């Protein structure tokens, strides 16, 4: 990857981590593994069900990788919610990642979307049918305002993925398009609203803080993800419709200029996030800070983002940014580098296979009439 701007990436990452005062102390190692396994186990059993297996039609290895990635994201970032809430959110966000990786045209299955919704019929699109079935398990954790945000943001996400099917980065001069698409498919409001379960927060009492958090999180969360994803997406053909690449097309600027634009906006958002909530409800600030730090840890430690490659490349360099980045990376790894073998078991495919064999045995049992049962 000769053209990747490594030095610039190091400087940007270091500034971000310094701005949020990164210091992930969300869990002990034992607590982290316990929560990871609990959320994974419930989610794995969910996706091993015959209905999910039949309707999703996802390659088993891809589903396994998606589930492990999402469980890590939720457990590391939603550190204050219950284990049950973590598990239900893990299922929901795994559905979104599965859709994000899909290449199916949604148009045919969406022709009667509203008519089916209004009539209470099952959606023709299999993803919507499954997500709607699971939604009550998610929404039971939240009040009506937060729930509305989760529903609406999920609908926006579906639309954003639909747009991405066209592999369209925007027309030159359409300056609003990149942020429009990123807000649409970023799940920012869903994430921002799902930090406030009703067993921990009264959404009426904390309405102003929650509303502001949803507004601020929309940009912060997706922009940090875009920065941390920049390395893995740089030469990946599947990831060419990214915010940075769309900036290049629509604003008619260079890649370096686009990255600088994203960097400045992310750093400004990080400053705002810390400053706005510094003097607000301490529980609210603690929740936001734990999310921010856990979210960064997840990016640094999850193999999906390949940031260990950057670490290996620069760990012997003597520049200030390289040394700072490596220190932050090692700090994250000390708390967040947990092998999947310690918590992501059994595999979904194994669970699905066991269920399938069980269903076959059940179907092969001899039928006994009521008279035979009495005899």
Swiss-Prot record:
Pathway membership, UniProt: Sesquiterpene biosynthesis; trichothecene biosynthesis
One Pfam family in the UniProt entry: TRI5
Keywords assigned: Lyase
InterPro entries found in the cross-reference section: Isoprenoid_synthase_dom_sf (IPR008949), TRI5_ascomyc (IPR010458), Trichodiene_synth (IPR024652)
Root EC class: lyase
Catalytic activity: (2E,6E)-farnesyl diphosphate = trichodiene + diphosphate
Gene3D superfamilies on file: Farnesyl Diphosphate Synthase (1.10.600.10)
Coiled-coil portions: none
Enzyme Commission number(s) of this protein: 4.2.3.6
SUPFAM superfamilies on file: Terpenoid synthases
GO terms classed as biological process: sesquiterpenoid biosynthetic process
GO MF entry, a single one: trichodiene synthase activity
Domain of life assignment: Eukaryota
The UniProt record lists the keyword DNA-binding: no
Record-stated family: Belongs to the trichodiene synthase family.
Purpose of the protein: TS is a member of the terpene cyclase group of enzymes. It catalyzes the isomerization and cyclization of farnesyl pyro-phosphate to form trichodiene, the first cyclic intermediate in the biosynthetic pathway for trichothecenes. It serves to branch trichothecene biosynthesis from the isoprenoid pathway.
Any further remark recorded for this protein: Trichothecenes are sesquiterpenoid toxins that act by inhibiting protein biosynthesis.
Protein name per its UniProtKB record: Trichodiene synthase
């Amino acid at each position: 990857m000769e053209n990747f701007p490594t030095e610039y990436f190091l400087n940007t990452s270091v500034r971000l981590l310094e701005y949020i005062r990164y210091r992930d102390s969300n869990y002990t190692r034992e607590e982290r593994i316990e929560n990871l396994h609990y959320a994974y186990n419930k989610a794995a059993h969910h996706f091993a069900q015959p209905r999910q297996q039949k309707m999703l039609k996802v390659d088993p290895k891809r589903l396994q990788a998606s589930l492990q990635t999402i469980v890590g994201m939720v457990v590391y970032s939603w550190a204050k919610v219950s284990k049950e809430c973590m598990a239900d959110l893990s299922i929901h966000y795994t559905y979104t990642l599965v859709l994000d990786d899909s290449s199916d045209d949604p148009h045919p299955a969406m022709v009667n979307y509203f008519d089916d919704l209004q009539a209470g019929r099952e959606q023709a699109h299999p993803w919507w049918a499954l997500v709607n079935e699971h939604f009550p398990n998610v929404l039971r954790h939240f009040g009506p305002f937060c729930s509305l945000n989760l529903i609406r943001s999920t609908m926006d996400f579906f639309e954003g993925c639909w747009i991405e099917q066209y592999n369209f980065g925007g027309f030159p001069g359409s300056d609003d398009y990149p942020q429009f698409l990123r807000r649409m498919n970023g799940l920012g409001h869903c994430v921002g609203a799902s930090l406030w379960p009703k067993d921990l927060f009264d959404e009426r009492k904390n309405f102003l803080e929650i509303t502001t958090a949803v507004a601020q999180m929309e940009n912060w969360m997706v922009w940090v993800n875009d920065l941390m994803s920049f390395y893995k997406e740089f030469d990946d053909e599947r990831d060419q419709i990214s915010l940075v690449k769309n900036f290049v097309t629509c604003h008619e600027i260079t890649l370096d200029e686009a990255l600088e634009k994203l960097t400045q906006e992310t750093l400004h958002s990080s400053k705002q996030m810390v400053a706005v909530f510094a003097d607000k409800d301490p529980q609210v600030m603690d929740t936001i800070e734990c999310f921010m730090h856990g979210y960064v840890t997840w990016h640094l430690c999850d193999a999906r983002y390949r940031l260990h490659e950057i670490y290996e490349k620069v760990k012997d360099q003597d520049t200030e940014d390289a040394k700072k980045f490596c220190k932050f990376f090692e700090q994250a790894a000390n708390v967040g580098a947990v092998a999947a073998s310690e918590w992501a078991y059994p595999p979904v495919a194994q669970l699905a296979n066991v269920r399938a064999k069980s269903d076959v045995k059940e179907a092969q049992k001899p039928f006994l009439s009521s008279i035979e049962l009495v005899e």
